[in-house]
């Protein structure tokens, strides 16, 4: 008969596998017994971190707490994380939102803030004082003179594409690049450029063609002067 609780060593360290076919009470009983049996070989070092794989189910916070308590009190292990093959409705909704491309054809004027959960395509200009916030990438088919914040919730892999003019500012996650120096003040027309965070953790401004190389998953964006 297949055990409902198994402890295995993996390439990522120690993992405890809990069957998604068993009830929580069955798992608690078998886990307690398995850990009690292993106490015959005491370990005196620091507590070892362990991952708990729970299969095609979700535990409530209370159930996670109960499993954590059993492991903490009956072994020299501590849980680093619970891993499930499924996601909650809230997680699924957020994933769907972040995977969408939102688009608008308008002008973002001073004082306006447009915020979207996924990628954003604007056909129009961003005036000084206007701002776009996106959890994903931002593509602007127009002049950028305001603030563009891609990867708003911390996605450092996000990119921005558009015509950057004085006094625009590009933000990607927590990085900032400004076009507010005197060098940019007299520039009234420019080509489309891309902005991204390089391996050194700095925002780089480069040709639009670089998007395909640095972010190959973005392959359908095309733009021209």
Swiss-Prot record:
Keyword annotations: Cell cycle, Cell division, Septation
Gene Ontology biological-process annotations: cell morphogenesis; division septum assembly; regulation of cell septum assembly
The keyword Protease is annotated on this UniProt entry: no
KW Metal-binding (keyword) present: no
Protein family (similarity comment): Belongs to the MinC family.
Subunit structure: Interacts with MinD and FtsZ.
NCBIfam families, sorted: PRK00513.1-3
UniProt function note: Cell division inhibitor that blocks the formation of polar Z ring septums. Rapidly oscillates between the poles of the cell to destabilize FtsZ filaments that have formed before they mature into polar Z rings. Prevents FtsZ polymerization.
Name recorded for this polypeptide: Probable septum site-determining protein MinC
Organism per entry: Listeria monocytogenes serotype 4b (strain CLIP80459)
């Amino acid at each position: 008969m297949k055990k409902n609780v198994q402890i295995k060593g993996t390439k990522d360290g120690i993992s405890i596998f809990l069957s998604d076919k068993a009830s929580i009470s069955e798992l608690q009983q078998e886990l307690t017994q398995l850990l009690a049996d292993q106490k015959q070989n005491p370990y005196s070092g620091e507590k070892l971190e362990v991952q708990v794989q729970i299969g095609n189910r979700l535990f409530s916070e209370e159930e996670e707490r109960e499993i954590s308590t059993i492991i903490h009190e009956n072994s020299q292990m501590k849980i680093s994380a619970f891993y499930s093959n499924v996601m909650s409705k809230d997680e699924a909704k957020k994933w769907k939102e972040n995977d969408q491309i939102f688009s608008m054809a308008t002008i973002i004027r001073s004082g306006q803030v447009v915020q979207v959960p996924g990628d954003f395509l604007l056909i129009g200009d961003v005036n000084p004082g206007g701002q776009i916030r996106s959890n994903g990438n931002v593509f602007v088919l127009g002049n950028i003179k305001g603030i563009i914040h891609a990867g708003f919730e911390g996605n450092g892999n996000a990119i921005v594409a558009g015509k950057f003019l004085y006094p625009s500012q590009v933000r990607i996650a927590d990085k900032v690049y400004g076009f507010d120096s005197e060098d940019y003040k007299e520039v009234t027309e420019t080509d489309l450029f891309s902005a991204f965070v390089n391996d050194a953790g700095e925002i780089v401004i480069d040709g639009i063609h670089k998007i395909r190389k640095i972010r190959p998953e973005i392959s359908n964006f095309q733009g021209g002067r």
